[in-house]
Amino acid sequence: MAIVVVTGTNTDVGKTIASAAVCQHYSRQGFRVVPVKPVQTGEPKGSGDAQTIEKLTGIVGKCFARFPEPLAPNLSAQRAGMQQLNLEEIVNKIRELDGPQTVVVVEGAGGLLVRLADSFTIADVAAQLDAPLIVVTNMALGSLNAAELTVEAAQRRGLKVLGLIGGSMPKNPDLATSLNVAEMEKVTGIPLWGSIAEGAGQLSKEAFCQLVEDLHLPTMWP
């Protein structure tokens, strides 16, 4: 039915927690939700982003490949002497998970243009799937520039950006962070659906569910 790709302005901006929020939101609306992490680096089998999403939401996800070192996937694969990912194979696997009343939530690695393999990025995956993007950004000093660059890079590739989610929002934001929240929609031209509090990954399923209700995620996208 629908596939959406969650990417970020950088690594460690809160993509996994935001992906969990998106999964929780559509699951509560009655959709069958399938979280997908095409590639995980730096985590042993049984741990990683898919497992974090499962812990927060109870929804079991898919991870297609793992490379040992916490690097860009192409570099981690190279250094381990492992075969790199294949774009067509990844796209076909994701398409196979789609179906009636299904929302497939694909979480990228790092930022929009991080190399999943030498020959492609998560932007290329989204383009092949004709899937829109959700961009996760922090709100600290410098985030306006990073968010605008990410949105611009996506749009120049013909990708639709549905919305922004702020990740790892501190309990007591400083002046720059507070102002950036107010300015984010203006500089990017993309709606900010809300921000996820710092430490949300440690919440119980019940508390995380309440947090998701405070976000302004859309019922469904056109």
Curated annotation (Swiss-Prot):
It comes from the Bacteria. ATP binds at residues 12-17, 49, 107-110, 167-168, 197-199. It catalyses: (7R,8S)-7,8-diammoniononanoate + CO2 + ATP = (4R,5S)-dethiobiotin + ADP + phosphate + 3 H(+). Mg(2+) binds at T16, D49, E107. It is an enzyme of class 6 (ligase). Keywords: ATP-binding, Biotin biosynthesis, Cytoplasm, Ligase, Magnesium, Metal-binding, Nucleotide-binding. Pfam families: AAA_26. GO terms for molecular function: ATP binding; dethiobiotin synthase activity; magnesium ion binding. InterPro entries: DTB_synth_BioD (IPR004472), P-loop_NTPase (IPR027417). Its EC number is 6.3.3.3. One of its GO terms (biological process) is biotin biosynthetic process. It is found in: Cytoplasm. The active site is at K37. NCBIfam families: bioD. Homodimer. Catalyzes a mechanistically unusual reaction, the ATP-dependent insertion of CO2 between the N7 and N8 nitrogen atoms of 7,8-diaminopelargonic acid (DAPA, also called 7,8-diammoniononanoate) to form a ureido ring. This is ATP-dependent dethiobiotin synthetase BioD. It comes from Corynebacterium diphtheriae (strain ATCC 700971 / NCTC 13129 / Biotype gravis). The gene is bioD.
